[in-house]
């Protein structure tokens, strides 16, 4: 049987809260998912690549600032330009 996974948006890291509270909340959300027996998969664009599941270093970089907010209207441009963005 496959392990359950839970998709989490990354906007809390990039636009939802100020640093370092944004990182603390995102890590707490992932831990809450783990406590329920599932694997958290925070979704973001990292340097132009779609990532489903982020490393602690990637979460820190997104939380520190400078990331865009990804949506349908700018997704192609963000990917082509190698940008990082929250979902």
Language-model region placement:
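N-terminal glycine-rich phosphate/adenylate-binding segment common to multiple enzyme folds
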Residues: 77-87
């Amino acid at each position: 049987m496959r392990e359950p996974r839970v998709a989490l948006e990354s906007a809390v890291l990039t636009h939802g809260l100020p640093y370092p509270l944004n990182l603390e909340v995102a890590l707490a959300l992932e831990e809450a998912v783990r406590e329920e027996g599932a694997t958290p998969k925070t979704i973001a664009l990292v340097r132009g690549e779609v990532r489903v599941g982020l490393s602690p270093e990637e979460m820190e970089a997104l939380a520190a600032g400078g990331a865009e907010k990804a949506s349908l209207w700018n997704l192609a441009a963000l990917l082509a330009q190698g940008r990082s963005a929250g979902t």
